[in-house]
UniProtKB/Swiss-Prot annotation:
Gene behind this protein: purL
Pathway as given in its UniProt record: Purine metabolism; IMP biosynthesis via de novo pathway; 5-amino-1-(5-phospho-D-ribosyl)imidazole from N(2)-formyl-N(1)-(5-phospho-D-ribosyl)glycinamide: step 1/2
Annotated source species: Neisseria meningitidis serogroup B (strain ATCC BAA-335 / MC58)
Protein name as it appears in the record: Phosphoribosylformylglycinamidine synthase
Function: Phosphoribosylformylglycinamidine synthase involved in the purines biosynthetic pathway. Catalyzes the ATP-dependent conversion of formylglycinamide ribonucleotide (FGAR) and glutamine to yield formylglycinamidine ribonucleotide (FGAM) and glutamate.
Entry's localization field: Cytoplasm
Length: 1320
């Protein structure tokens, strides 16, 4: 039994968070109360802690001891919200790490809770309602008093496994276990198991049954994609997977790995990769090597429905692990994320087309999913250190052909690209005797049965089993594991990893068997060697839980010491759990009970199961012709702009770090006004090359209601038109990932799936494209009982195509931002060829008018021809802007381009309207005069169809002098009849769309943009500080204040470090990181470029005495999330120095040395600010606290470099320029100084607006720092700290927007060159 010390912390909830809770309570009809809150810390130890340790704890936690914990009383109600009893929170793991590294002995664990006090009259039912408001039942408990908190530290006794009596009870015993355990076994699988266990003459253990269920779930084995199909009574010739494989068989060139690893690998290029060299004491060096591109896209739909934050977070984390575990280890690089949900029904912004059909109680509402889910995914990516650069967001919920169609079971998609050494792309054979290792976090009782649960229709499982199946994420420990993997593959041919898998569905019970089965081996495991963070888990829970942030891998015994040294340096847990055998048998030994919870041949677990047969028939949708003649076009335009699929996605984008790693070229935000309209994402392969990688997406699920195969072809087409304006070359260089969602088992849906796969396979082969990777989620149906009524919501067939390609030169990428140049025109290329089909369009959705024919990719040859022309124009720099047509049609394309360029448009659609009318009303067009045609209802309908159809196509901005040549290129490809010159830019802030002299739409662009951003604004208000959301919304149209610009007082192209570089002298710089830091590579690259000799220095190196700061002339503390920022940003890192006497002395000596420089950036800035007591000349320095928005802010912000003592900024003084910010706690706080800012503070960097004025206006000032403070320096200027990230934008190609004159270097290179000059 642990001794538990309670410590009282600071106020937990900000005023606006309290207000939001009170508003939610009022909406539930709860009585008015007063609410206060405070953090409490519970420190568990084997015996009472001495006074000195308690004093250190109080300083560490910013908390106080209490003689007696407070109690509830009449009229004052306590809700003590803690981590869920029986679990250990990620917060506790990291806080306990900090305590250990601060030398605090005897502490078992530190947990944090929040005491919420409600003053007022509440009955028991109302208390329960309040408890539900205050906690997340997935991860938290609500306790009635402080004494109960001791249960956080209760240790349960372990139990052995249980069995199912198949020998005695036969099949019926297994059928019963199937239901009780939520195994989702089919009748064939039950027969298979009964037959095999009877042959083995033994009963199965519960562990073996759970393991079998996970390993053979639809989620893991993709039985439907390998099934036989009988459609309309006829057996089909190929499986779904066979048709996907056909694409690769037809076009294998450029693909290195397909269908046989965690990710696909496609050919990249020989480049110089930058990373620390273990042979040179971790000195950063460039390494020339063949480097390939990893591509992977996953979905995490079921968990996101149940617990949006945790579901989306672990979805992102699982996909990252898939990339990292490819081959013998690789590096994830950039991510994508997408969400599809049912109608949002935002309070105070309910849209006229939204219908609320209700939902089951145990799943989250679409609005809650979109408030919490994106934060979960972004938080994981941010903390791990992967930029998220691409995505989509769609809502749909509507009655169609008698069924409610929608996404109560949402789509949450997570994917990305990575880099891998050519020599690491294939796993090696695991020899007998090889060690089998778990790397990463400990096991705990979460995510039990997730693979099986994800394979079931939502609502068919027991609600408690659904909750058990959701995992929780800890990205900081996944970062540590990735660092271990990086250190291994960076050894090249000496990489100790033989083979590696991520731990996902089924936990170790699926991962370890996969690892050895791939090598045709067996294995013996010791169950009690599995690292655990919970006591009392039984064998099933240990072996099958889906605790995240884990990998399994194999190494030779001779490499164990070297591997251990890598793990210890990175502070990453690992354990040798088993040994490979040559008998094909799987044995899991439990030494605690001297028995074997698992003991069976691998061919029973992963053997050839009875093949699935799917039988279905065609269910044709009802055909209703499209009519829109009586709809006001301007009203339609405004409705379409509010539909989430069309509307601005700011609220999804600015929460995600888009620059970490320093290799981002093109993110979602475009132009000097940072408008979220990019068609694709582009990254660079390295720090001294312009080669890169691109990715785009295509998805058209509403089209599938009308014509599923057409929707599949359109997805492929959209992915191509989205990526077309990147310098890729041959279309065959593009490779696709296909993620398939369907409600299989619902009548007609299996047939649609088959025909769509068939159509996509044929289209890809015709386009010279292949699909080397993909995934499926085929239980996209939600069922529940509402009183006497049985309800269901069935998702349309939903294919998501993600396209990946190597890029020749990232600088040639063309964006939708219109350029304000003289004599330019807009050309529209209509790949719908005038058909203007409206089925599944945004226009139809906002009027509940789901009718018409489906748009389609009718001619793959013409799409190839279009792509070829665009590629030539990109290569020849003939395109000024490019934007493809998709949701919202041509109207959305035009307004989005205008929003990005902040310019007016004068658009004449006369010829395009004529073509659309003639194509669809040939007889009328031949028999009537023009004026008679325009009086018809069919003409009004033609206007709507021309503006809002979503056929493939694109608008390009070109110089007038190039028009003839460009038309000729299209002529050569027989596309000239489908190219229209439609308009020009104007200086007015107006969008004019006309038919000759008749205005169809004439409206103010500011008003249109406010409408476009309304949905994002309202969600932001609900999620973040509403005052900040309102401030950002108010800036729309204020172009002067919100524009980016560059006013530098030096020659950007002059390298002032060159003389020092040429001298050959390279000062050594320590690139300092702590566990959880993720920005070290780009920091080292920037300083290396400026002539420094950069070394990777981990805090563990300093603690162990392997490295000493006295060996360096400069220290750079890097950005990231040290210890996950659990004790305040950078505070745990700083206190591990301040509380460690030897380290304290070492840092103090370094800071006092007049011949050294220090730079702290972001997390490093926060850390160094907390070391102010040992840094000379820092009187008045602030600490950095949570952003005013209470949200992570990732922006390209304007800053000014004022006159200061800073030596590294000396060469930049007086300059104003944009810089990346990415932080959640960047607000300079002067509470330690009574809120006063000292006159001689040493402000080194300030946020400004577009008029070069220091600003407090959000988001121009992204965190609310007073006087716009973004950085400070000490008195003699040797030590400078700043929240922005100059190291991520020292090259011009790293900037989302840059002025024309910046070519290779950006203005921020001067900071690094200035540091080199300052050292002489």
């Amino acid at each position: 039994m642990s001794v538990v010390l309670p410590l009282r912390g600071v106020t937990a909830l900000s005023d606006f968070r309290v207000e939001k809770l009170l508003q939610k309570a009022a909406a539930l009809g709860l009585p008015e109360v007063k609410l206060s809150s405070e953090f409490w810390y519970f420190v568990g130890s084997e015996k009472a802690l001495d006074a000195a340790t308690v004093e250190k704890l109080q300083a560490l936690l910013a908390a106080q001891s209490v003689e007696q914990t407070p109690k509830a009383r009449e009229g004052l109600h306590l809700f003590l919200v803690t981590p869920r009893l029986g679990t250990i929170s990620p917060w506790a793991s990291k806080a306990t790490n900090i305590a250990e590294n601060c030398g605090l002995a005897g502490i078992e664990r530190i947990e944090r809770g929040m005491a919420v006090w409600l003053e007022g009259r509440l009955n028991d039912e109302q208390k329960q309602q309040w408890a539900a408001l205050l906690h997340d039942r997935m991860t938290e408990s609500v306790l009635p008093d402080f004494q109960t908190a001791s249960k956080l530290f209760h240790h349960l006794e372990s139990e052995t496994f249980s069995g199912v009596d198949v020998l005695g009870g036969g099949k019926e015993a297994l059928v019963k276990a199937n239901t009780e355990m939520g195994l989702a076994l089919s009748a064939d699988e039950i027969d298979y198991l009964v037959e095999n266990y009877q042959a083995l003459q033994r009963n199965p253990s519960d562990v073996e049954l759970m393991m079998f269920a996970q390993a053979n779930s639809e989620h893991c084995r993709h039985k439907i994609f390998n099934a036989d199909f009988i459609l309309n009574g006829e057996k089909q010739p190929k499986s779904l997977f066979g048709m996907i494989r056909d694409t690769h068989n037809a076009h294998p060139e450029g693909t290195v790995v397909a269908y046989k690893d965690n990710s696909s690998v496609i050919e990249g290029a020989k480049i110089e990769r930058f990373y620390p060299n273990a042979a040179e004491n971790q000195g950063y060096r460039f390494h020339e090597e063949d480097t390939h591109i990893i591509m992977k896209v996953e979905t995490h739909n079921h968990p996101t429905a149940i617990a949006p934050f945790a579901g989306a977070a672990t979805g992102a984390g699982g996909e990252i692990r898939d990339e990292g575990a490819t081959g013998k280890g690789s590096r994830p690089k950039a991510g994508l994320t997408g969400f599809t949900v049912s109608n949002l029904n935002i309070p105070d912004l309910k849209q006229p087309w939204e219908q609320d059909y209700g939902k089951p109680e145990h799943i989250s509402s679409p609005l809650d999913i979109m408030i919490e889910g994106p934060i979960g995914g972004a938080a994981f990516n941010n903390e791990f250190g992967r930029p998220n650069l691409l995505g989509y967001f769609r809502t749909f919920e509507e009655k169609f052909d008698g069924q409610v169609r929608g996404y109560h079971k949402p789509i949450m998609i997570a994917g990305g690209l990575g880099s891998i050494q050519a020599q690491q792309t294939h796993k090696d054979e695991i020899p007998e005797g090889a060690l089998l290792i778990q790397l990463g976090g400990p096991g705990m009782l979460i995510g039990l049965g997730g693979g099986a649960a994800s394979s079931m229709d939502t609502g068919t499982n027991d609600a408690s089993l659904d909750f058990n199946s959701v995992q929780r994420g800890n990205p900081e420990i996944e970062r540590r594991a990735q660092e271990v993997i990086d250190r291994c593959w960076q050894l090249g041919g000496k990489n100790p990893i033989i083979s590696i898998h991520d731990v996902g569905a089924g936990g170790l019970s699926n991962a370890f068997p996969e690892l050895v089965n791939d090598a045709r081996r067996g294995a013996v495991f010791k169950l009690r060697e599995v690292p655990l963070e919970e006591h009392g888990l039984n064998p099933l829970q240990i072996w099958c839980n889906e605790s995240q942030e884990r990998y399994v891998l194999s190494i030779l015994e001779k490499d164990l010491d070297a591997f251990r040294a890598i793990c210890e340096r990175e502070r990453c847990p690992f354990a040798v759990v088993g040994t490979a055998t040559d008998d094909g048998h799987l044995k899991v030994r439990d030494d605690l009970f001297a028995n074997n919870p698992v003991d069976l041949p691998l061919n029973v677990l992963l053997g050839k199961l009875p093949k699935t047969t799917r039988t279905d028939k065609t269910v044709a949708p009802s055909k209703k012709p499209f009519h829109a003649g009586d709809i006001d076009i301007t009203e339609a335009a405004y409705r379409v702009l509010r539909l989430p699929a069309v509307a601005a996605k700011n609220f999804l984008i600015t929460i995600g770090d888009r620059s970490v790693g320093g290799l981002t070229h093109r993110d979602q935000m475009v132009g000097k006004y940072q408008t979220p309209v990019a068609d694709c994402a582009v990254t660079m392969m390295g720090f001294n090359t312009y080669r890169g990688e691109a990715m785009s997406m295509g998805e058209k699920p509403t089209v599938a209601l009308f014509d599923a195969p057409a929707s599949g072809r359109m997805c492929v087409g959209e992915a191509i038109t989205n990526i077309a304006a990147v310098n890729i070359g041959d279309i065959g260089n593009i490779k696709l990932s296909a993620n398939w969602m369907a409600a299989c088992g619902n009548e007609g849906e299996d047939e649609k799936l088959y025909r769509t796969v068939e159509a996509v396979s044929k289209a890809c082969q015709a386009l010279d494209l292949s699909i080397p990777v993909g995934k499926d989620s085929l239980s996209m149906k939600t069922v529940w009982q509402d009183g006497e009524e049985k309800k269901s919501v069935v998702s349309p067939l939903s294919l998501i195509i993600s396209a990946f390609a190597p890029v020749k030169d990232v600088r040639k990428t063309v964006t939708p931002e219109l350029k304000n140049v003289e004599d330019s025109v807009l050309l529209f290329v209509d790949l719908g060829f005038g058909k203007a089909r409206m089925g599944g369009s945004a226009f139809g959705q906002v009027y509940n008018n789901m009718s018409g024919d489906a748009p389609d990719l009718d001619d793959t040859g013409r799409l190839k021809a279009f792509y070829s022309v665009i590629q030539q124009l990109v290569a020849e720099n003939k395109l000024l802007a490019y934007h493809d047509r998709s949701d919202g049609g041509l109207f959305a394309v035009l307004v989005e381009m205008a929003f990005a360029g902040r310019c007016g448009l004068d658009i004449d659609l006369n010829l395009l309207l004529a073509q659309t009318f003639i194509t669809n009303h040939t007889a009328l067009s031949q028999s009537l005069r023009t004026e008679e045609v325009k009086a018809l209802a069919e003409w009004q309908e033609t206007i709507a169809r021309t503006l809002f159809n979503e056929e493939l196509g694109a608008v390009i901005q070109v110089r007038k002098q190039d028009v003839a040549d460009i038309i000729n290129l299209f002529y050569q490809q027989q596309l000239h009849h489908n190219v229209f010159e439609i308009g020009t830019l104007t200086d007015e802030n107006t969008l004019i769309i006309r038919d000759g002299q008749t205005h169809l739409i004439s409206d103010n662009l500011i008003k249109l943009q406010q409408t476009w951003q309304e949905t994002s604004h309202q969600i932001q208000r609900l999620r973040d500080n509403p005052a900040c959301a309102d401030s950002e919304f108010a800036l729309i149209g204020d172009n002067e204040r919100s524009a980016l610009f560059a006013d530098v007082k030096f020659d950007v192209n002059e390298d002032i470090a060159a003389p020092f570089i040429n001298s050959g002298a390279k000062p050594k710089i320590a690139i300092l990181r702590e566990q959880g830091v993720n920005g070290q590579i780009e920091m080292a690259a920037a300083f290396t470029r400026a002539g420094f000799d950069a070394y990777d220095v981990h805090m563990s190196d300093l603690m162990a005495g392997r490295i000493h700061l006295a060996d360096f002339k400069m220290l750079a503390a890097c950005g990231g999330f040290s210890y996950g920022d659990v004790l305040g940003a950078g505070e745990g890192w700083a206190k591990s120095i301040l509380f460690h006497p030897a380290l304290r002395d070492q840092f103090a000596a370094f800071f006092a040395d007049p011949d050294t420089l220090t730079l702290g950036v972001c997390n490093g800035c926060q850390m160094v600010s907390n070391l102010a007591e040992i840094i000379p000349g820092t009187a008045g320095w602030p600490k950095f606290k949570r952003n005013l928005s209470e949200q992570f802010e990732a922006r390209l912000s304007m800053v000014h470099v004022p006159k200061s003592a800073s030596l590294i900024l000396n060469e930049m003084q007086g300059s104003s320029l944009p810089v990346v910010v990415s932080h959640g706690e960047g607000r300079a706080d002067f509470a330690l100084h009574g809120g006063n800012i000292s006159a001689d503070l040493g402000i080194a960097l300030q946020y400004i607006d577009g008029q070069n004025q220091v600003t407090q206006t959000y988001p121009l000032n992204p965190n609310g720092s007073p006087q716009g403070i973004a950085g400070v320096t000490n008195a003699d200027g040797r030590i400078t700290i700043m929240m922005p990230h100059p190291e991520r934008v020292y090259r011009a190609a790293q900037m989302s927007w840059k002025p024309e004159g910046w070519t290779e270097l950006s203005g921020w290179y001067r900071l690094f060159a200035g540091a080199r000059k300052a050292l002489g």
